[in-house]
Amino acid sequence: MGERKGTNKYYPPDFDPAKHGSLNGYRNSHPLRERARKLSQGILIIRFEMPYNIWCDGCKNHIGMGVRYNAEKKKVGNYYTTPIYRFRMKCHLCVNYIEMQTDPASCDYVIVSGAQRKEERWDMQDNEQILTTEHEQKQRLETDSMFRLEHGVQDKAKLQRAAPSLSELQEVQSAWKDDFAINSLLRSKFREEKKQIKEEEERDQALLTKASLDLKLVPEVEEDKKIAALLKYRSLESYEQKQKKKRSEICNRSWFSPGVDSGQQAPGNTMRKLGIRTKTPSVPGISPVSLGVVRRTSKEENKAEDKSVESPDGSRSRKAEGMCRKEETGCKEEITERTQSECKLNTELTLTTSTLAAQGQTPTIHTVSCLVPNYSDSSCESEG
């Protein structure tokens, strides 16, 4: 488009280059258009940017540095050969006009009217900035040799005071001198960290897959390891440690039971400790009489006995009745004794079985049936 604008301009038929010179002269216009409407007065409209913070005198509002205005630019004088320009602009918050102009002597802008500057300046010497050489001082350095010598001594003293800071800055800069080596070292470090992160992610993903979980794992820390170790529900000792502990207990264990004299121990205990199995004595045979079982008599025998003990007048004799009571009491005493002996025998069998199991031998189990006699229809029961 720019190329077409330069080559495809329309020249009317009455255009005379000797008379008009250019199309702008033919149309009586300026290339800057509206910006040059006051050019006859020496005023050019430009875009001015506020150089520092100010307060407007009309509305007392704050105008920040960098705010732009359409300002009228006008030349008002010279500083030596440097022109001094004045800028006039309207506040965007009120109808007040602000005027500012350049100050080439101090390389700054000065407010002429309409505003006040927000004072944020400081002494360049106190702030350790580079000072601009004054014109008078420059002329004196060129003409006065003694002043130049004193100024050189001051510069050397200042250099000695700044030497440690300068050397420190040089060391910092030298660290970044070989940028290729530093970049290679940094990239290798990044690759190692990336590899570690990838391994941790794979390990975490395998753990989540194994546990069928769908959550984000946080990085593991040493404190979490200690807490997790305390929450384990299994022994912390390994299989080898358990076996070693068990062997040491067996080696340190006494061959003789505590509280029993070695001379009073039975030979069977020594045989068990040596690992020699002995034949377990069998339990003596149990007969129905030892268990207190009473054989029932038939009805015919009961009738015969009743007839033999009845008196001629048809009543049971006192003698027969006393014999029955005596027989019944004897049966009950015999049953009580048999029951106590059976309980004692069962207790001995239980103790023997537990002892053999503790010593690693297979106990011989003997089943003892407990028969309960029924005396509801015995011959000793009194009738009607």
UniProtKB/Swiss-Prot annotation:
Give the UniProt family note.
Belongs to the CWC16 family.
Q: Per the record, what is one GO cellular component?
A: post-mRNA release spliceosomal complex
Its keywords, alphabetically, are: Coiled coil, Nucleus
> Highest lineage ranks of the organism?
Eukaryota, Metazoa, Chordata, Craniata, Vertebrata
Protein purpose: May be involved in mRNA splicing.
GO BP, sorted A to Z: mRNA splicing, via spliceosome; RNA splicing
Coiled-coil region:
183-212
Residue segments, region Disordered: 1-28, 275-331
Q: Which PANTHER family match?
A: SPLICING FACTOR YJU2, SPLICING FACTOR YJU2B-RELATED
User: What is this protein called in UniProt?
Assistant: Probable splicing factor YJU2B
The cellular location(s) given in this protein's UniProt record come to:
Nucleus
**Top-rank lineage group of the source organism:** Eukaryota
Compositional bias, Basic and acidic residues, is annotated for 297-331
